[in-house]
Amino acid sequence: MYKLLDTITGPADLKNIPREELPGLADEIRRFLIETVSQTGGHLASNLGAVELSVALHYCFDSPADKLIWDVGHQAYTHKILTGRRESFHTQRQYKGISGFPKRSESPHDAFGAGHSSTSISAGLGMAAAQDLKGSGSRAIAVIGDGSLTGGMAYEALNQAGHLKKNLIVVLNDNEMSISQNVGAFSSFVSRKMTGSDFRKLKKEMQGLLENIPAIGKDILHFARRAENSLKGFLTPGMLFEALGFDYIGPIPGHDLPQLLEVFENVKGLEGPVLVHVMTTKGKGYQPAEENPAAFHGVGPFDVATGKTTGGKPGAASYTGVFGATLVKLAEEDEKIIAITAAMPDGTGLTPFAKRFPERFFDVGIAEQHALTFAAGLAADGFRPVTAIYSTFLQRAYDQVFHDVCLQKLPVTMALDRGGLVGDDGPTHHGTFDLSYLRHLPEMTLMAPKDENELQHMLKTAIYAGRPVALRYPRGAGYGLPLDQTIQSLEIGRGELLTEGDDVAIVAIGSTVYPAQEAAKLLEARGIRATVVNARFVKPLDRELILGAARRTGCIVTVEENALQGGFGSAVLELLADEGMTDVRAKRIGIPDRFIEQGPQPQLRKDLGLDGAGIAATVEAFLTAKGQAALSLVK
C-alpha cells in the first residue's frame, strides 16, 4: 500500500532510502496521516506542514543518540511514524493507545515529553549542556513553531543559550508567516552557502589573519562583520536571533527536501547555538486543511473527500458555547466587561465576543502569565476583565494569580475551561488540580456549576463579585437544559440542597452533581436514603448546609473531579475537623494521586468511579464497612 513507508520500522531504515526518493516518502506519509487522522481525529494541519522537516531531521541526525525535542507536540506525528509507531498510530489519542504528544515512557526517541508550549528550547539547552558535560558529542535539536515563540519561556531559553554557547540547534518551524520573511532564490542560496563548511573554514581563517595584522587588522575585521551582518539583515529576518548569540540560518523552504538535507548536514558541523528558520505551509497537501488550517488544527473524525467532520449530531450546547454567549449578553449591558484569551479564542468560546466587541477583546498569545497581570492592570483601573483559559494552562500563571490578582484584591474573573477530565489529550491537558491549587489563596472565591444553566448565573456572579474569582467548568456538552432568560447573581458561599435522606450525605461539586443524583437514585433502590448537596462553592463553603447534612446523617461523602490531595473533599474534612465533629464518618471520591491517561470522558469517569454507578458502589461499600474510624481519611 505504501511502497517506501512499508519498509520503515525505525530511523535506521529511513537512511537506507536514496535521497532522490525521499519526496515520494513524504507524499506517502502525508497520505497516511490524512487517512489515519480522518478516522481517529487529532492535530492534522500542523503535522501535514512538518512532514519534510521531520524526514530531513531523522535522515541527517541519529535519534535517539541525538536528541530531537518537539515543542508542544502538535508537529510530532511524522516523528512517531518514523520511530516505530506506525503500526500503532491508529490508536493515537485513543483509550489505552499511544499519546498524541511526545512521551518519554512511550519511546526512547521521545527525548522530552510535551503538551504545553514553549518548553523545547529550555529542555534542549539542558540536554546540550548534559552532552557537553558527558563529552558525548551528541546534538540536541529543539523544534519549535512560531506560535510558541509568543511564550516568554522560549526567549528566556534563547537568551541563556546565546550566553552559554552550547551546541544547540533550534529549528523554527514558521507556518503562520508571523515573522517577517524575505524568501527568494538569492536568500536561499546565501543561507545554504553561509552554512557550508568551506565558508565557515574560510571565515575563521580570515578572522585569524586579520586579527594579526598590526594596527589596522581589527578595524578591517570589525568592518567585515558589519558588512556580513548588514547583508544577512537585508536578506533575512534573523537579526533578533543573531543579537541573542545565535548563528541564524534561513529562511529555508520547508517542503524542499534537498535544501533541508543540505542545510542540516552543514549545520551538524557548526559550533555553538544555531537557529534554522524553516518556512512551511500548515495543512500542506490536503486542500481543506490548507484553506482552513485553524479548523484542522485539532479536528475530530472527518470525511477525506469533503473535509467535513463525521459522526457529530446536533445536541446540547457546550459549556464553552454557553460561557461565550453569556459573556456577550452581559457585555451588551456593561461596557466595562473585557475578554482576554491566551491564543485560544475559538477553544475558549470568545470568538463571538471578539467579533461583537473587537475593541474590548485581547488575545495576548501563548502568554498566560502576561494574560493574568494584564487583566489585573485592567481591573486596577476600573474594568471587569474576564480571562478565559484552560484549567491546565492556568498552572503556568500561578504566581500572577497570587501576586498580581489575589494579593491586591483585584476583581479579575478567571474562567477555567476544561476543568476536570478532558479526554483524548490526556495527562498534559486534564484540569484536575485547579481546586487544590486555588482554594488556599486568600481573597479567592472558587465556584463550579452543576450544569450549563447554572454556569450563566455563576458568570454574572463572578464578574460582579468585586474580588478575584475562579469559575471552573468542564469540557463538552451540557445537559440540554433550557437557559433562564434572566441572568441573576447567586449568593456567594451558598450551596443547594437537592434531595434529603437520613443515611448518608453526598456533597458534590461541579460536573459530579448529576452523577451524585444518579447515585442517590441507585442507592434508594437498595434501601439507602441519601441527602444530595450541590456545593456550588469550593471557597467559601456553605458551612451551614454542609454541617447540617453531616449532623443529620452522621456520614458524609464528597465527590469531585479533581485531585483528592488538597481538593474539595479536603476542604470539607477541614470544616468538620474545625467544628469538632469527630463523630461524623467521612469519605472522599475523586482523582487519585496519579496522572490520568487519555480516553473518552465517560470511560475515564467509569474507571475512576466518578459515574453514578461508581459513586453508588463506593457509598454502599463505605456504609457497610466494619470498623470504620470516625472522620476517615481513607480514599
UniProtKB/Swiss-Prot annotation:
Name of one Pfam family that matches: Transket_pyr
Enzymatic reactions: D-glyceraldehyde 3-phosphate + pyruvate + H(+) = 1-deoxy-D-xylulose 5-phosphate + CO2
Single GO molecular function: 1-deoxy-D-xylulose-5-phosphate synthase activity
Family: Belongs to the transketolase family. DXPS subfamily.
Protein name: 1-deoxy-D-xylulose-5-phosphate synthase 2
Pathway where it operates: Metabolic intermediate biosynthesis; 1-deoxy-D-xylulose 5-phosphate biosynthesis; 1-deoxy-D-xylulose 5-phosphate from D-glyceraldehyde 3-phosphate and pyruvate: step 1/1
Organism, as annotated: Geobacter metallireducens (strain ATCC 53774 / DSM 7210 / GS-15)
This protein's encoding gene: dxs2
CDD domains: TPP_DXS (cd02007), TPP_PYR_DXS_TK_like (cd07033)
Keyword annotations of the record: Isoprene biosynthesis, Magnesium, Metal-binding, Thiamine biosynthesis, Thiamine pyrophosphate, Transferase
Biological processes per GO annotation: 1-deoxy-D-xylulose 5-phosphate biosynthetic process; isopentenyl diphosphate biosynthetic process, methylerythritol 4-phosphate pathway; terpenoid biosynthetic process; thiamine biosynthetic process
Cofactor(s) required, per the database record: Mg(2+); thiamine diphosphate
Metal-binding found in the keyword field: yes
Keyword RNA-binding annotated: no
Domain of life of the native organism: Bacteria
Enzyme class name: transferase
Co-factor binding details: Binds 1 Mg(2+) ion per subunit.
Record-level GO cellular component terms: cytosol
PROSITE patterns named in the record: TRANSKETOLASE_1 (PS00801)
Self-association state and partner proteins as the record states: Homodimer.
Function: Catalyzes the acyloin condensation reaction between C atoms 2 and 3 of pyruvate and glyceraldehyde 3-phosphate to yield 1-deoxy-D-xylulose-5-phosphate (DXP).
